[in-house]
Amino acid sequence: MKEFSVIIEKDEDGYFVASVPTLRGCHTQAKSLDTLMKRIKEAIELCLEVEKPTSNEFIGVQKVAVNA
């Protein structure tokens, strides 16, 4: 079994959006977190069928403040 880091955001329409940094193009969306987690697992399995994960290690997400 392999583990992947998943980034989860909520868009302006209220959908949860998940993406996998180490699998290019691997993302999905859903109205609930439960559905999102099921869908991202399916998306990861499909992505692994056509592409190997990048060797980049996911470190984390950091907030950065700028004057805008």
Task: Describe these PLM feature segments.
Residues 1-5, 11-13, 38-68:
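Short, charged, surface-exposed hinge/linker loops at domain edges
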